Amino acid sequence: MGNKKKTRKTVPKEFISLFRVHSGRDAPRRDTREVQKSKKHGFRFTSLPDLPVASNALQELLLEYGLLNDIKWDSKGLKASKNKKTKLKPINSFIAFRSFYSRTISNPEHQRELSSKLADVWTQESNQEVWKQYTQSYNNYLLLPDAKLNFVDWLCEALDYTIDNTTPQIEDISLTSYNQLLSGTIEDVYIMK
């Protein structure tokens, strides 16, 4: 049976990376028991940042679609919604942003319009990094065996934030002018010299 050489299996150099751990640069470690109890932040070592303040353009957009949702929505002809058991999937930061801010819009047509307008707002959004942190934590949460919450519910639970699904409060002056626009009345306008 002769002379058998034992060959060593080696890993090619392009698949090896070297790194060094510096004790002064270690992130403070969080107690893993606390993470297991709360199950809010998955593998994060620090807490999530607070919900960012919406920009003026975003506030105007949400106000417009919130009012349209309350005023023009006609639910006739719709089938009763079935509680579909959807599989929770990892998301990106724009999807998180869009789903959070469009959660109260129930009209499908308005949701489609709002989605494209939110995409325009997203390009100018200064808090994209905050939304990226939210999605990273949410995607880690999805790795847990008992993950059952969608992104909006998970974020609200993680930030101890309660959702107010009522119409946003506006000043009486702007509300009356908005109602006049929607009332269908036509006023005559005369130019006087």
Swiss-Prot record:
DNA-binding region: 86-142
Domain of life: Eukaryota
One MF term in the entry's GO annotations: sequence-specific DNA binding
Biological process according to GO: positive regulation of mating-type specific transcription, DNA-templated
Transmembrane segments: none
Induction note: Induced by HBR1 in response to hemoglobin and growth signals.
Subcellular location: Nucleus
Free-text function comment from the UniProt entry: Mating type proteins are sequence specific DNA-binding proteins that act as master switches in yeast differentiation by controlling gene expression in a cell type-specific fashion. Transcriptional activator that induces the transcription of alpha-specific mating genes.
Further information: The C.albicans mating-type-like (MTL) locus contains, in addition to the genes for the regulatory proteins (MTLA1, MTLA2, MTLALPHA1 and MTLALPHA2), a and alpha idiomorphs of a phosphatidylinositol kinase (PIKA and PIKALPHA), a poly(A) polymerase (PAPA and PAPALPHA) and an oxysterol binding protein-like protein (OBPA and OBPALPHA). MTLALPHA1 is not represented in the genomic sequence of strain SC5314 because that haploid assembly includes the mating type a allele of this locus. Most C.albicans strains are heterozygous at the MTL locus and do not readily undergo white-opaque switching and mating, but mating occurs in hemi- or homozygous strains. Mating takes place in opaque cells, produces tetraploid progeny and seems to occur rarely, if at all, in nature. Conservation of mating capacity is rather thought to be due to the simultaneously regulated white-opaque switch, which seems to play an important role in host commensalism.
Name the record gives this protein: Mating-type-like protein ALPHA1
Originating species: Candida albicans (strain SC5314 / ATCC MYA-2876)
Gene: MTLALPHA1
